[in-house]
Amino acid sequence: MYKRQVLTLLIFLKILNPAFIKSVSYLSFDLYQKIFAEERESEVVIIDIDEQSLGKFGQFPWNRTVFAKILDQLNTSNPKAIGFDIFFTEKDKQSPDEIIKSYNLIPSDVSELQNLKGPDDLFAEKLKESKSIIAVLGSNVPSHANYNRKAKARFLSKGGKPEEFTYAYPYSIGSLEKLEKNVQGLGSISFLDQLDGIIRSLPL
């Protein structure tokens, strides 16, 4: 009898105040994470875009040659993977093509610039030489940075249909196609909002 009353109360709370039930669920989940937390040594290194780096390289976004040099430096340590959680959605403003478009140059200067390798091309080459992954974000609205990108990883499933339990985005936001085609993988940084602003799960 007691169990039935508790169950009835929970059902009414679920209907009348679903946010309360979710809050209790979040608290329980967080408590379990603290009780059963596993201590692990992390070998992850974060390269932060902070005030010091902005003072050295100038305002963001930086020239893509800066990122090419960063990759060169990182590759000396033979990392297992290099992930970028920023987007490179537009051409580098300091690329030869963009300079030619922006300024009224004499033909000889135009010819000289056209023979130069652009920052995006250099960055793409360095990405190809590295174990690099670039971020992709799921979106519900179309973006100029969208094209018919395909996943680089293979997906295997067993049992039911996983698409019935995963959140699907109609569009995606990422980087220039030239850059994405030269990385080893595309990593999703999509997340679903929760009531308290804490990320506990990620949509596949």
Whereabouts are the PLM-identified features?
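Non-transmembrane functional regions of envelope-associated proteins
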Residues: 3-204
